[in-house]
Every structure is written in structure tokens, then in C-alpha cells.
């Protein structure tokens, strides 16, 4: 267990890594944690459709407290500036920041959590501590991002965040986490953990592409073929997570976008953002959640439990293309009655030419869908997006 995270008095469930060998991967994919995670990701995608990151959205007092926690962690970066050292990657000052973070987090969580939720402090602290990278290797990757997804999902399962927080948890809290993660990457020259280079979606992140494509699934002001255009990036980088990611990539990498980010470049061939979202979720399940080198480092506890789901339990889907998804397709985390309300943006998206999206697009499930696309790694320079049958002709890149 991470140093600085101490159990309070009383008997608490053990928090431990459960995936010890390849045989455990099948157990993981049938676990309650796996199903809750997919439900949370897809439910959030359904909830944030058509809502910009900069829109006025509801922020509860608890969510504001969580945002202030990140302000405190950011101050630690100022207090631990990078050292002058000969090696290009892995500034050793990151280890000082990580140690300070581990020492401060228990106090921050103690102050933040109400008394009836303090029993979850250890588990929440474990997930959050693991969200910022590895202090030994001074690297960061999608496994650390996954730990933060466990943290977010746990906040809802413990009812620390409520149904009304589903939109702001993604567009405010996750976005704030993303800002700090990028600051750490730049300040300490952190190496990407487990990146496949040009054939990976991104060196560091994955989920902001999923949720960012969901934001654009209705009333998008531009179609997918345009997201690499400089004018689009400049205008919309603050409004959509997907474009924020593209902007960050363009700042840290040089050369033609199709050469250093081939997977993302191939997405410009996909006709709708809803299909992009479906393909990205499938890719996330295959390339991140199904990889032993990633999941062997994941911790499980009471909130994100390794216990199996009932036989026949299916993964929840995201059904995009509707501003108000049907109740059966909304998020379900832990218990069937944890369902978020239909989001209402107080500031509607600007009038713009909308994508032509069918009302029933492919589900983001583990099963194949006639209207989804599949993204897969390739060793060739051909497109990495395989459209399903009947998806229609793909537009050519300009």
C-alpha cells in the first residue's frame, strides 16, 4: 500500500492487486469493477453529449472541494521545481513531488470526506495516489489514468458524488486531473509508460478521446475530417476534450500529424463522432483493459471489487446521437437505481452545421455492432479504422 495512506481505526476491507497472472484476466473481465467501470465510462459519454467543457454546468459543493484538492497538488509542483540534470527524460524532482503528494493526500481526503464516508478514505486514497505516475521509473501512462477512473467511479459508488454530478465530474474534475497530469509530464519530462509509439492512440491518455468524441456526438460544429485543421484546433481546444488532446499533441510533437499520430490520423476517415466513440471504447477494452502489463498493477477494494458479477450480466452501452438517452441506456454504477438525470446545459452549443447522425448508432459495448467501427494496431501505413458492414462510404481527407 502506498506510503502516507494509513487505515483509520476499525476493520476495513483489504486493498490489493488481484491480477497475478494471465489466468486472472478472465476473472477481471467478469468482475463487478470491470462492469462498473464500463458502465461509468459509457454512462458519462451519454450524459455529456452536446455539452462543451466551457458551458455553465452544475457544480456541487463536494465537487468544488475535489477541485480545490487539485489546487493543493498543483502547488506542490511549484514547491518542487525540476532539477538541472544531464538526462533528457525523467527529472528526479518528480520523486520529491510524488513523496510530498503521498504525504499530503491523507490530510486532504480527511478534510474533504464527511464523517459517514471516512471508511472509504484508504481505498480512495490508494486510487488517487496511483493516478499520477510511477516515482521509480518517472513515467506516466494509461494505467495511471485508469486508476483515476477507479477513483471517479468510486466517488459515485460511495455516493460521495451524486447523480447530478455526472457531467461536472467529467468536464470539470476529470479535466482538472488532465491539466495536472500534463503539467507533471512537461515539468518533469516524464516518459510514456507502455506506449507503442506511432501505433498508440496517444503516449499518455485515452479516456479524454472517448469522452471528447461523446461531447461532439450531437450538434458538432465540425465533422471528424476537420479535427486536425489548425483553425479548428485553435477555435475549439478549450471547448472539447478531444480537441484539447489534439492541441497538446501538436505542442509536444513535431512533423506531419499522420506520421507521429497515425492512429488518430486514421480517425479522420470515420463519418460520425458517434461511430468514433464506439470504436474508441472497443479499442480501450482491447488495448488497455485486456492487457496484463496494465491490469497487474491495478488495486481493488470494497468499492471497486474483484468479486464476479452474476452469470449472464451484460456490459452497459453508450447510445449516442440522442440529447436525452433512454433510461435503459443511462449510467448504472453498482446499483440499478443510480441513474443520472438528463443533462441540461444552461448555455446551449452555438448554432452550427450538425453532423448527419442516425438516431440509433452503434452501441459502445463489448459485442460487435453493425454500426460501429473497430480501431486496431497495424504495422502498415493503411487506415487503422475498419468500418462495419453497411456503414457507408467514408469521406476522403482534404
Curated annotation (Swiss-Prot):
Recorded superkingdom: Eukaryota
Organism whose genome encodes this protein: Drosophila melanogaster (Fruit fly)
Chain sites annotated for binding ATP: 137, 142-143, 293, 296-297
Primary site of residence: cytoplasm
Pfam family, one: PTPA
Alphabetical list of InterPro entries matching this protein: Phstyr_phstse_ac, PTPA_C_lid, PTPA_sf
Subcellular location as annotated: Cytoplasm; Nucleus
Record protein name field: Serine/threonine-protein phosphatase 2A activator
The reaction(s) this protein catalyses: [protein]-peptidylproline (omega=180) = [protein]-peptidylproline (omega=0)
GO MF annotation list: ATP binding; metal ion binding; peptidyl-prolyl cis-trans isomerase activity; protein tyrosine phosphatase activator activity
Compositional bias ranges of the Low complexity kind: 363-388
A Gene Ontology BP annotation from the UniProt entry: mitotic spindle organization
EC number: 5.2.1.8
Family stated for the protein in its record: Belongs to the PTPA-type PPIase family.
GO CC aspect terms: cytoplasm; nucleus; protein phosphatase type 2A complex
Residues given in the record as Mg(2+) binding sites: 197, 203
Disordered as annotated region, ranges: 343-398
UniProt subunit comment: Associates with PP2A heterodimeric core enzyme PP2A(D), composed of a catalytic subunit (subunit C) and a constant regulatory subunit (PR65 or subunit A). Interacts with the catalytic subunit Pp4-19C of the serine/threonine-protein phosphatase 4 (PP4) complex; thereby mediating basal localization of the Miranda (Mira) complex; probably by facilitating the dephosphorylation of Mira.
Keywords recorded for this protein, A-Z: ATP-binding, Cytoplasm, Isomerase, Magnesium, Metal-binding, Nucleotide-binding, Nucleus, Rotamase
Function field: PPIases accelerate the folding of proteins. It catalyzes the cis-trans isomerization of proline imidic peptide bonds in oligopeptides. Acts as a regulatory subunit for serine/threonine-protein phosphatase 2A (PP2A). Modulates PP2A activity or substrate specificity, probably by inducing a conformational change in the catalytic subunit, a proposed direct target of the PPIase. Acts as mediator for the basal localization of the Miranda (Mira) complex during mitosis of larval neuroblast asymmetric division.
Keyword NAD attributed: no
Amino acid at each position: 500500500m502506498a506510503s502516507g495512506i494509513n487505515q483509520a481505526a476499525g476493520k476495513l476491507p483489504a486493498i490489493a492487486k488481484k491480477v497475478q497472472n494471465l489466468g486472472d484476466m478472465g476473472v477481471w473481465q467478469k468482475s463487478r469493477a470491470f462492469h462498473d467501470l464500463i458502465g461509468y465510462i459509457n454512462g458519462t459519454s451519454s450524459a455529456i453529449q452536446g455539452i462543451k467543457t466551457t458551458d455553465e454546468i452544475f457544480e456541487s459543493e463536494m465537487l468544488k472541494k475535489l477541485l480545490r484538492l487539485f489546487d493543493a497538488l498543483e502547488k506542490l509542483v511549484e514547491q518542487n521545481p525540476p532539477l538541472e540534470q544531464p538526462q533528457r527524460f525523467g527529472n528526479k524532482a518528480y520523486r520529491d513531488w510524488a513523496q510530498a503528494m503521498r504525504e499530503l493526500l491523507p490530510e486532504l481526503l480527511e478534510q474533504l470526506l464527511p464523517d459517514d464516508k471516512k471508511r472509504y478514505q484508504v481505498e480512495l486514497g490508494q486510487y488517487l495516489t496511483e493516478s499520477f505516475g510511477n516515482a521509480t521509473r518517472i513515467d506516466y501512462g494509461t494505467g495511471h489514468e485508469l486508476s483515476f477512473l477507479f477513483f471517479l467511479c468510486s466517488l459515485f459508488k460511495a455516493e460521495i458524488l451524486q447523480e447530478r454530478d455526472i457531467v461536472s465530474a467529467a468536464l470539470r474534475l476529470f479535466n482538472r486531473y488532465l491539466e495536472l497530469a500534463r503539467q507533471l509530464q512537461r515539468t518533469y519530462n516524464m516518459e510514456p509508460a507502455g506506449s507503442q509509439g506511432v501505433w498508440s492512440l496517444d503516449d499518455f491518455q485515452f479516456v479524454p478521446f472517448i469522452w471528447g468524441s461523446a461531447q461532439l456526438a450531437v450538434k458538432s460544429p465540425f465533422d471528424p475530417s476537420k479535427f486536425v485543421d489548425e483553425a479548428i484546433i485553435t477555435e475549439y481546444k478549450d471547448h472539447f476534450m478531444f480537441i484539447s488532446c489534439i492541441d497538446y499533441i501538436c505542442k509536444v510533437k513535431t512533423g506531419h500529424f499522420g506520421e507521429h499520430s497515425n492512429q488518430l490520423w486514421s480517425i479522420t476517415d470515420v463519418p460520425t463522432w458517434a461511430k468514433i466513440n464506439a470504436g474508441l471504447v472497443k479499442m480501450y477494452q482491447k488495448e488497455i483493459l485486456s492487457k496484463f502489463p496494465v491490469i497487474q498493477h491495478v488495486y481493488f477494494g470494497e468499492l471497486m471489487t474483484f468479486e464476479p458479477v452474476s452469470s449472464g450480466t451484460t456490459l452497459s452501452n453508450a447510445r449516442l446521437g440522442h440529447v436525452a438517452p433512454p433510461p435503459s441506456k443511462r449510467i448504472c454504477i453498482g446499483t440499478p437505481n443510480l441513474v443520472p438525470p438528463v443533462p441540461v446545459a444552461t448555455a446551449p452549443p452555438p448554432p452550427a452545421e450538425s453532423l448527419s447522425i442516425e438516431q440509433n448508432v452503434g452501441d459502445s459495448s463489448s459485442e460487435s455492432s453493425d454500426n460501429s467501427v473497430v480501431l486496431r494496431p497495424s504495422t502498415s501505413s493503411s487506415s487503422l479504422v475498419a468500418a462495419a458492414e453497411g456503414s457507408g462510404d467514408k469521406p476522403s481527407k482534404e
